[in-house]
């Protein structure tokens, strides 16, 4: 796209600036302002919602972007929660609370390891079993 025009827009989900792109660039993920992650197809001239997942994080406005690695979509919240979803279905794989401070955009290294930083100063590596 070289023209800068809006291809499609939807008001179906109440999202903010938290948009992430899948590794294969066929899906976009966004955190809603209340509890959920939504996933839309990138192809086409009309919005096509693929799934929505209620992660249960409550009211949310942190600008951390969803990230995908090896079929897992990772996200974080203003309340110290990091979570992982199946990128194809939106099924919650796990949730882990780091603390009570905002977690910045996480950096998944692979399917089992995620780097994170928090606004309270923590820097860490989560390893899943």
Stretches with model-predicted labels:
Residues 1-3, 42-46, 86-90, 128-129:
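Short loop/turn segments that connect beta-strands within beta-propeller blades
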Residues 56, 81-82, 87, 97:
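C-terminal soluble interaction/assembly domains
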Residues 10-38, 57-82, 102-124, 128:
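Repeat-blade elements of multi-bladed beta-propeller folds
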Residues 5-11, 45-57, 92-98:
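Aromatic (tryptophan-biased) beta-strands that constitute blades/sheets of beta-rich domains
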Residues 87-108:
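Short cationic/low-complexity microdomains
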